[in-house]
Amino acid sequence: MPYLYRIAYDGTMFYGFTGHPNSLEPRLRLIFGEILGRGSRTDPGVSAVGNVVMTGRKMALGYVNSKMPKGAWAWGIAEVPEGFNPRRAKLRRYLYVAPHWGEDVDVMREAAKLLTGTHDYSSFIQLRGEKHTPTVTTVYDIDVTLRGDLIFIYFAGRGFRNKMIRKMAWALLAAGRGVLSVDDLADLLKKPRPGAVPSAPAEGLVLLDIVYDVKFEVDFSALRKAYVYFLSKSRHLSAHAAALRAAGEALAMWES
């Protein structure tokens, strides 16, 4: 029977989630054996609160966490049916944090409305070379919030393509600075131009949650340890530190 494990990690401690000897997944294989699936393949530098991995082994979370590398925790477990695909989530939530350097937040919100909905997002995707990479997807919501000297951009959708959120974050910040107009963004959606939009730095991005019709058994001790870790690393005022603090706050919400 397959099992899903909720995991949180500091993205700066690993070279991405998978695809590299120093990524997180090879460390997880040492604990679980075969990895049958994962919720998201986050890039190097991207942190996560609620990513998942699927394995064929049920293991006590206390034991798993005794073997986890520094900067990573398994804090939930759920049994799922045979054939379950963790890529087919109901919803994915991400947060991008950036320093506020005078961007017009109202313009960013106007641009965010434009980027929501169902579109061909080719201009906002880094294609990996596959011949049939799907570029049409749906973004349910983008919320732009100013908190002190930082901009928080929340994204919600069923699925995001490679580098899509970081490219949209760059575009929204560029719109707020007047580098791109809302009309420019509309044109990038109507007349897609792959490679036209750069990616914002990875360290500002956090995978907050992947939603399934699954009930997880939660290890609150692991949650608290992850929370304390993220807060302890967020003492310095930077986008990455703020992203880690937001990750800690998101973890704390699971305890309430």
Swiss-Prot record:
Active site: 43 (nucleophile)
GO biological process, one term: tRNA pseudouridine synthesis
Annotated substrate binding sites: 94
GO molecular function, one term: RNA binding
EC number: 5.4.99.12
Top class in the EC scheme: isomerase
Superkingdom to which the source organism belongs: Archaea
Record-linked InterPro entries: PsdUridine_synth_cat_dom_sf, PsdUridine_synth_TruA, PsdUridine_synth_TruA_a/b_dom, PsdUridine_synth_TruA_C, TruA/RsuA/RluB/E/F_N
Catalytic activity, as annotated: uridine(38/39/40) in tRNA = pseudouridine(38/39/40) in tRNA
Stored Gene3D superfamilies: Pseudouridine synthase I, catalytic domain, C-terminal subdomain, Pseudouridine synthase I, catalytic domain, N-terminal subdomain
Keywords of the record: Isomerase, tRNA processing
UniProt similarity note: Belongs to the tRNA pseudouridine synthase TruA family.
Role noted for this protein: Formation of pseudouridine at positions 38, 39 and 40 in the anticodon stem and loop of transfer RNAs.
Name the record gives this protein: tRNA pseudouridine synthase A
